[in-house]
Amino acid sequence: MAGEILRRYTQLPALFYMLSEKTLTLLDPNSWDDKNDSYFLEQYKAKRRLKTVLALCFSTAPETYHHWSIFANGSAGICVQFKRDELLAAIKGCDGVRYRNVDYMLLTTAKTKRLRTKDLPFTKRRPYISEEEWRIIYESATHEKHSQDIAFPLASISRISLSPWLPEALKNRVKESLRKIEGCSGLEISRSTLISNEQWRKMGEQAV
């Protein structure tokens, strides 16, 4: 069913840290490419008089070329699929943590509707709607932090997809390295076939 899986697109170094530490790492959004998005989070931080606002983004959408090319580009890109309910059970109740789907709004709508401060971390412009983003934020009024780790069970990972641009010759060695991490020997890991799929090609060959 839709919404049962949360996809986290990132890079191999971040994945090695995630699996080794068994944590999700929320970071400062100031480095994000979408400056409108990071500005809303800055405004939320200022209006709530917070010392820290950090975030981590997922997608509820199926695998797409757009997600790979924007969020996990290159041969070191990866996509971790999480079982939504199991991940939520792990983070629910964590101090300072909020999470929800992102709302996408037209500029014309925003001009006629005054935004609420509490919604700023989860509001983006309509052109980003294809991301189908689900977001976790961490906030603190007393502690200034540059990152925040949240523990999660490895059992909440459904599968890991390696980059479709990862050379075939490197695929098995990367899998072996990941499965050597404590607790990761049974993880389902495969290289994405998004840009080169044998079944799709065969259908072309069998066309009449």
Residue ranges and their predicted role:
Residues M1-V208:
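Partner-binding and oligomerization surfaces adjacent to conserved cores of proteins
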